[in-house]
């Protein structure tokens, strides 16, 4: 009986330790694929490209994203931003920070 209890405790501790380590190292959350997030974002009308994407867990239930978004037309920025945030929320990403660029100001290779 004691070994069974010890095994249950070890299994619980391992799961908690793994999740805590992933959170503390800002790892990509389980179930989130960066390539799928990029495809979802680029499918929004008005988005020409997406780059410099970072996704991390804020907690065990909340995820965050930052990304650079290249727009076909800057005047549509607010509309595109609302659509992107709605799509990302559906994908389980609730805290979103986006930096918008025109295709003329695109920063490949120079983004920090």
State what each model feature region is.
Residues 1-112:
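Alpha-helical transmembrane segments and adjacent TM-loop junctions that form the membrane-embedded core
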């Amino acid at each position: 009986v004691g070994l069974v209890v010890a095994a249950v405790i070890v299994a619980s501790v391992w799961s908690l330790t793994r999740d805590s380590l992933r959170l503390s190292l800002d790892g990509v959350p389980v179930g989130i694929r960066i390539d799928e997030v990029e495809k979802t974002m680029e499918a929004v009308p008005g988005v020409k490209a997406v780059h410099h994407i970072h996704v991390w867990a804020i907690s065990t239930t909340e995820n965050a994203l930052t990304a650079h978004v290249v727009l076909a037309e800057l005047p549509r920025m607010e509309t595109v931003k609302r659509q992107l945030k709605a799509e990302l929320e559906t994908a389980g990403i609730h805290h979103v920070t986006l930096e918008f660029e025109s295709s003329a100001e695109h920063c490949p290779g120079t983004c920090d």
